Structure formats: structure tokens, C-alpha cells
């Protein structure tokens, strides 16, 4: 192996059996990671390290992406490439980068949108590149009640999405592609040269032309249908299934429900809000409710009415039920769908004593006949007295 040269497969992080697609995918990731424009202002040492990495990655890709060069490298290694004169001829890493990403590519987003995305129409040429005029993803919100959350529900949502203008095929020009002329701003190049000062002196970089979006062309006359916007708005109705047990703030995603442009389709993201209940509270997959009962019924036992997710139901409260005591009804909680869990949660009822009813004097005298010392109160008073003695 040539002195100082790393194995090209190791450089790209792929195996020797990697396909051309695997190699290109690895190159795109590493080239973006080490591109000098991404490390401006990080210090001379860091910039130098990334420049060397960038050159190394591009060199490895130039060899492994070429069937003939890769075959020679696999058989004879770096020495074989040296014999063929590859290492002596030199190369420009930016030429390789631009051949993959396009000549108009730039990390400079001045005046651009964070949603700008370049794709090709047919051949990968500068004239065919198109910048998406809008984000493809659509986000909407929908609120459901606590009861709907516990059992799951169906919601119909209405929203407006954008689709490619069929009159101009997304070019924004009258007559479509035939109505496009050379861009005045970039003179048909698709990019604008920009001089920037750096520690190495004045560096010239390419910036995507914002006037034509990197196409090198612009509309001679705007499309009469879309007024040059390249799209039309379409009112859309969609029915969505909201599973039981969904949490407040969770999102449901339809991979093909978003905006469309030039054959690309975005996602529809539905953010679900769960309205709070005045009765119930969620604790994981269980449902908790505080229930007021008459102290006399709690003492003597009897029928009370309990709130459940299916409605109000009668329940026989045993005699001597204490305030704060819990009644657990298995399976009475959230009924998760198969997408979450198969077992339903529990309904937990917490008993609280209501204010005692008002009784007449004769009734109170009669009730006093049944009063006997309360052992819990007696223990509390003894502890209180001991506290004062200490």
C-alpha cells in the first residue's frame, strides 16, 4: 500500500462487497460531514483536518465509483493505481463533490428557505434541477375528549394541501418547460459566485441562485393558472383512526397525506390533543376517580353510584369503608388497541367522605347512643399526650 494512504473501503466505511449504491450513499454522508463550508470559523486546525478528510473521501469515491479503477485497486491496491499514474495526475475534490451534489450546491443559505430541497427531472443537469417552492410536510391538530381517548375514535379532518400545477407542470411558466428562458441573475448557470474572506485569503464559493432556484432558467411569462406559484391549493378531507390510549401531544403520521410537487409527496402529521376530564385522571394505563360518599353509608355500608368509562353504575359499598380507601375495578381503565397493548387498564376509585348530612336534635340523640370509642382516635390521642410529656 502506498505510504500514508488508508484503505479506500475503510475511508468510506463500507465492505469490499459493497454495491455502487452503498458506496455512493456512504460518500454523500461523509462528504457532507467534512465539506469545508460546514466548518468555517471553527479554527485553522479544525478546518485543515476537515479539508484533508474531505479530500480523502473524494479520492476514495473517485476510485471505488469507477468500475475500472475499482477493479485495479481490488487486485493491486494503491501500488496498482500508482503504476497507472492515478496518484500523480492529481484531482479536484470539489469536481467529484459537484458531480454528485450538483454544481449549484452550496451550504450558504442566505436568502434561502430551510425547506429548500433539490431533486432532478430526468437527467441530472443544472437546467433540470428544481427547488421545492414549499415544505411538503403538513401539520394539523385535532382535539378529542378524555372518553374518546380511552376507547379510541374516528375523526374527519379538513385541510388544504398544495399540488403541482398541471397547467405548467410546476415550472410556473406559461407553456410549462418550453416557456422557460435563461435566468438574468445567474446568466443560466444556476449559481452565483461569491467571494469570501478567510484565513487562507479570498475564497470564491458557489451560491445557489435564489432567482431561479438553481435551474438556470426562469419563466418568460408567468403561468395564468397558478400565477407563477407552480402549485394550486386543493381542499382535502381525510378520515383518521385515533387509537385508544393515545397520549396528549402524540402525533399520527400519514406518509402520503401531505403536499405534493413534481412527483414527491410529503407527510401529513396529525397532533392529537386530549381534553382534560373533570372526573377522571389518567395514570399510565389506569384511570383514577375521586368519589364522594356519605359518611353514614361508608360506616353502615350500602349502595353508592360510581362513575365508570361506560357511565354511572351502582356499587355495594361494604360497611366500615374508610376515607381514602381505594376500590379497584380490573379492566375498567383504558382499553388499548393491539397497536399499543392488549390488556385494558384498571379503574381506581378513591373514596372521600362528603360533608355529613344535617340531622334533627332527636336524630342526633339517637345517633349518639351508637357512638363508641374509636381505636384509631384513641391511639392518636395517646401519641399526642406522650409528645407533650417528652
From Swiss-Prot:
Record localization: Cytoplasm
GO biological process terms, semicolon-separated: chaperone cofactor-dependent protein refolding; DNA replication; protein refolding; response to heat
GO molecular function ontology, one term from the record: unfolded protein binding
Protein's organism: Mycoplasma pneumoniae (strain ATCC 29342 / M129 / Subtype 1)
Keywords: Chaperone, Cytoplasm, DNA replication, Metal-binding, Repeat, Stress response, Zinc, Zinc-finger
Family in the record: Belongs to the DnaJ family.
Protein name (record): Chaperone protein DnaJ
Zinc finger (CR-type): 152-235
J domain ranges (all copies): 5-79
Chain residues that bind Zn(2+) 2: 183, 186, 209, 212
Domain notes: The J domain is necessary and sufficient to stimulate DnaK ATPase activity. Zinc center 1 plays an important role in the autonomous, DnaK-independent chaperone activity of DnaJ. Zinc center 2 is essential for interaction with DnaK and for DnaJ activity.
Entry keyword Transferase: no
Functional note: Participates actively in the response to hyperosmotic and heat shock by preventing the aggregation of stress-denatured proteins and by disaggregating proteins, also in an autonomous, DnaK-independent fashion. Unfolded proteins bind initially to DnaJ; upon interaction with the DnaJ-bound protein, DnaK hydrolyzes its bound ATP, resulting in the formation of a stable complex. GrpE releases ADP from DnaK; ATP binding to DnaK triggers the release of the substrate protein, thus completing the reaction cycle.
Cystines in this chain: none
Binding positions (Zn(2+) 1): 165, 168, 223, 226
